[in-house]
Amino acid sequence: MTILFSVDIVEALYDYTATIDEEFDFQTGDVIAVTATPDDGWWSGELLDEERQEEGRHVFPSNFVRLF
């Protein structure tokens, strides 16, 4: 059985430096796969640069990105 689900892909508009352990740093132009979009504006996702991914860091501010 194959399960398919939709993942939004966003591009970073600005650099962001994490301020808590759950967040991750990213740079302008980075691409992020979004896994959850709660209404508080702090989305969950994964940086699509395996060399810079950090386990346990998945939260980022939605106002720093745009949908592709």
Residue ranges and their predicted role:
Residues 1-68:
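Src homology 3 (SH3)-mediated interaction modules
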